[in-house]
């Protein structure tokens, strides 16, 4: 569960290291984003010769959250950091690699390309 102004680590190789949430997409007054939700982010920290630059406004999908989430089978899922993957307008990832584990809930939201690039699906 992340909200406005939350800093997220970027789990792909686009060149961005950290982003900040500007808006949670999906409803008019939606306050919190969960696994698989799309957010509008601003790049806060980036490497010098990456695909994205500091200050750019992009879309991202949440792949890891520190806040635990309960699944239908009763298990809880919790990660060590809040992380996202930068995406294009057509929901495809901007990068070509995904670092770290990602949640299985992304499959239900239609992010199969992100799951195929991920090292580990939890």
From Swiss-Prot:
Give the UniProt record's GO annotations in the biological process aspect: translation
Q: Which PROSITE patterns match?
A: RIBOSOMAL_L14
Which Pfam families does UniProt cross-reference here?
A: Ribosomal_L14
Spell out the GO cellular component terms annotated for this protein, sorted alphabetically and separated by semicolons: cytosolic large ribosomal subunit
Q: Which InterPro entries match?
A: Ribosomal_uL14, Ribosomal_uL14_bac-type, Ribosomal_uL14_CS, Ribosomal_uL14_sf
Transmembrane residues, as ranges? none
Q: Which CDD domains match?
A: Ribosomal_uL14 (cd00337)
* Keywords annotated in UniProt: Ribonucleoprotein, Ribosomal protein, RNA-binding, rRNA-binding
Q: How does it assemble?
A: Part of the 50S ribosomal subunit. Forms a cluster with proteins L3 and L19. In the 70S ribosome, L14 and L19 interact and together make contacts with the 16S rRNA in bridges B5 and B8.
Q: Which NCBIfam families match?
A: rplN_bact (TIGR01067)
Q: What is this protein's record name?
A: Large ribosomal subunit protein uL14
Write down the species. Answer: Mycoplasma genitalium (strain ATCC 33530 / DSM 19775 / NCTC 10195 / G37) (Mycoplasmoides genitalium)
């Amino acid at each position: 569960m992340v909200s406005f102004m939350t800093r997220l680590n970027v789990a792909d190789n686009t060149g961005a290291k950290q982003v900040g949430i500007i808006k949670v997409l999906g409803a008019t007054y939606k306050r919190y984003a969960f696994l698989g939700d799309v957010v509008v982010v601003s790049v806060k920290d980036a490497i010098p010769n990456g695909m994205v630059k500091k200050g750019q406004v992009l879309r991202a999908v949440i792949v890891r959250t520190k806040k635990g989430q309960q699944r239908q089978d009763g298990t809880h899922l919790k990660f060590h950091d809040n992380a996202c993957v930068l995406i294009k307008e057509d929901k495809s990832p901007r990068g070509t690699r995904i670092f770290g584990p990602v949640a299985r809930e992304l499959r239900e939201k239609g992010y199969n390309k992100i799951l195929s690039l991920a090292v580990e699906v939890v």
